Amino acid sequence: MSDLPLAQAHGRFIRGSASKVRRVLDQIRGRTYRDALIMLEFMPYRSTGPITKVLRSAVANAENNLGMDPSSLIIKTASADMGPSMKRYRPRAQGRAFAIKKQTCHISIAVAPSNQSTTTEASD
């Protein structure tokens, strides 16, 4: 395991299913901060908005709390876990009601400095 510090951010109780959020997180995991922002901007999914907010928060934590350079950060971990479901009811014919589950999820993103920048500094 590497000894590089990680900066994390969490978005909790985000409306949307965890599986749909994971579909986007799988695309940006391991990429640089700049590449991830560009990808998120042009993806046609609704979950890119909350993911962008959590990613920017993780980078702000890295910059302010750990003094890292945002241009050298890569996304180390990105995960989405299921949150509680909000239960709603839709009225139907003859006095019946159908249950509707509005799913939520928790988004976690951790960023770390890329190994390329640290190895080039060490070799100089």
UniProtKB/Swiss-Prot annotation:
GO biological process, one term: translation
Keyword Ribonucleoprotein: yes
Short name of any one Pfam family annotated for the protein: Ribosomal_L22
Annotated protein name in UniProt: Large ribosomal subunit protein uL22
Quaternary context: Part of the 50S ribosomal subunit.
Molecular function (Gene Ontology), one example: structural constituent of ribosome
GO cellular component term of the entry, any: cytosolic large ribosomal subunit
Gene name of the encoded protein: rplV
PROSITE patterns, sorted: RIBOSOMAL_L22
Matching InterPro entries: Ribosomal_uL22, Ribosomal_uL22_bac/chlpt-type, Ribosomal_uL22_bac/org-type, Ribosomal_uL22_CS, Ribosomal_uL22_sf
Residue pairs linked by disulfide bridges in the UniProt entry: none
UniProt entry keywords in alphabetical sequence: Ribonucleoprotein, Ribosomal protein, RNA-binding, rRNA-binding
Keyword check for Transferase: no
Family: Belongs to the universal ribosomal protein uL22 family.
Function as written in the Swiss-Prot or TrEMBL entry: This protein binds specifically to 23S rRNA; its binding is stimulated by other ribosomal proteins, e.g. L4, L17, and L20. It is important during the early stages of 50S assembly. It makes multiple contacts with different domains of the 23S rRNA in the assembled 50S subunit and ribosome. The globular domain of the protein is located near the polypeptide exit tunnel on the outside of the subunit, while an extended beta-hairpin is found that lines the wall of the exit tunnel in the center of the 70S ribosome.
